[in-house]
Design a protein with these regions (language model features):
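Short terminal alpha-helical segments
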Residues: 3-33, 83-91, 96
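Extended hydrophobic, helix-prone interaction segments
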Residues: 21-24, 29, 35, 39, ...
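Amphipathic alpha-helical elements of HEAT/ARM-like alpha-solenoid repeat scaffolds that form extended
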Residues: 27, 65-68, 84-91, 121, ...
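Acidic, low-complexity, intrinsically disordered interaction modules
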Residues: 41-71, 75-82, 98, 129-163, ...
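Intrinsically disordered, low-complexity linker/tail regions enriched in Pro/Ser/Thr
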Residues: 97, 101-104, 108
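Boundary/linker elements of alpha-helical solenoid repeat scaffolds
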Residues: 117-121, 149-151
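Short, charge/polar-rich alpha-helical segments
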Residues: 120-129
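Long amphipathic alpha-helical segments
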Residues: 176-180
Length: 187
């Protein structure tokens, strides 16, 4: 498997260039190949734990299992940590982090009628977000203050496929109309 920390450091050393939105978005979408490599490396311990979490009907027990999994497995996963670092480097290197992300995330909450934290899965499972929505959601996950085992939003969003869903949405919306929309709304 690639050393994602090393790749992240190499990206950080790339000289700054004026790139088009399309070029920058395509650099971000390339991250999906690293995700696939990571997903293909899941061992039986990951898969069986995920299966147990998914089958659990008791909501409280489900949260406990998820917390334990994050604490005992994911927090010690060097490759997941590297993917997290790599994604953050890509977002900043290619200037894809949205400054006004909270404004757009709040619009997403209204669009999907999301109030409770547990309902966020409605948005996070969407694969049809426009570019601004998808980039705002990625920035929101990246900048979240919850770095304890209970939350670890970006790492867990990478692990559980949420980031891949968002990147798939970005890949599907790289077109002239959406890029023009970004040019208007993103400074």
């Amino acid at each position: 498997m690639n050393d994602f920390h090393k790749i992240a450091n190499e990206i950080a050393r790339i000289p700054d260039e004026n790139r088009s939105w399309e070029e920058r978005l395509n650099e971000l979408v390339k991250f999906r190949a690293y995700l696939k490599e990571y997903y293909d490396s899941y061992g039986e311990d990951y898969l069986s734990f995920l299966e147990r979490i998914e089958k659990e009907n008791d909501l409280e027990e489900k949260y406990i299992l998820e917390y334990d999994f994050k604490k005992e497995v994911l927090s010690k996963d060097y490759n997941l940590d590297g993917l997290n670092y790599l994604l953050v480097n890509i977002l900043f290197k290619y200037k894809l982090a949205i400054e006004d992300y909270n404004e757009y995330v709040n619009l997403l909450k209204e669009k999907y009628d999301v109030e409770l934290k547990a309902d966020w899965e409605k948005i996070l499972s969407e694969k049809d977000l426009d570019l601004l929505e998808a980039l705002s959601l990625l920035t929101f996950l990246q900048r979240s203050d919850y770095w304890d085992y209970e939350h670890m939003p970006l790492s867990y969003a990478i692990f559980d496929g949420t980031v891949d869903n968002i990147l798939e949405s970005i890949e599907d919306h790289i077109d002239e109309e959406n890029i023009e929309f970004l040019n208007i709304f993103v400074k």
